[in-house]
UniProtKB/Swiss-Prot annotation:
Membrane topology: Peripheral membrane protein
One GO cellular component term: matrix side of mitochondrial inner membrane
Expression induction or repression: In conditions of increased oxidative stress, the protein is stabilized, increasing its mature intramitochondrial form and thereby protecting COX from oxidatively induced degradation.
UniProt entry tagged with the keyword Ubl conjugation: yes
Residues spanning the signal sequence: none
Maturation and modification: N-terminal mitochondrial targeting sequence is cleaved from the mature protein once in the mitochondrion.
UniProt name for this protein: Cytochrome c oxidase assembly factor 8
Lineage: Eukaryota, Metazoa, Chordata, Craniata, Vertebrata
Length: 192
């Protein structure tokens, strides 16, 4: 029996509707370029009364597990800045790896196709299975792919460290703010 699409959309809409004000999910991420990997938001939705971040199932394109961030009702501006920075970093990371994986798979298919064609072989064997190359031949592709993308990965790693240091810095500020709020003397309400 074929799956019913409208039911899936209804479940997702209901899940988001019943999640309440106290539990909002990170915004949907979108492809920024035409050749970028397509965007896909998981149907996963944390329980309505959850007061924690939840890690969802792996993304179809990036293979990373997205985090569904909990937004408390009394979130301070500093906590909001930290959460938004984490969301932005997650979206950036998801998009990078979705694009990288798409490029990898396209180039790998082209490499295999060209090598099989050079050997005079078809893409399918006589038994109908997909023809493959041996480990040594694939090692050439992996080495070439890594060499070609070295600069891109170097910039990614540099930006990844910058973002993580910024997140760690804001986490420290949030922790200090919470400690200060606990230690600060409470204002007594005066009745007139």
């Amino acid at each position: 029996m074929a799956p019913r699409r409208p039911a899936k959309r209804l479940v997702t809409a209901l899940c988001r509707a019943f999640s309440g004000r106290g539990c909002q999910l990170a915004p949907k991420r979108g492809a920024e370029r035409r050749d970028a990997a397509p965007s896909r938001v998981s149907r996963f939705c944390p329980p309505r009364k959850s007061r924690h971040d939840w890690i969802g199932p792996p993304d179809k394109y990036s293979n990373l597990r997205p985090i569904h961030f909990y937004i408390p009702e009394n979130e301070s501006p500093l906590e909001q800045k930290l959460r938004e920075l984490r969301q932005e970093t997650q979206e950036w990371n998801q998009q990078f790896w979705a694009d990288q994986n798409l490029t990898f798979h396209k180039e790998k298919e082209e490499f295999v196709r060209s090598r099989l064609k050079a050997k005079g072989l078809d893409l399918r064997t006589a038994s109908g299975q997909k023809a493959t190359l041996n480990a040594e031949e694939m090692a050439e592709f992996y080495k070439e792919f890594l060499s070609k993308n070295f600069q891109k990965h170097m910039y990614y790693n540099r930006d990844w460290y910058k973002r993580n240091f910024a997140i760690t810095f804001f986490m420290g500020k949030v922790a200090l703010e919470r400690i200060w709020n606990k230690l600060r003397p409470k204002q007594k309400k005066t009745s007139s």
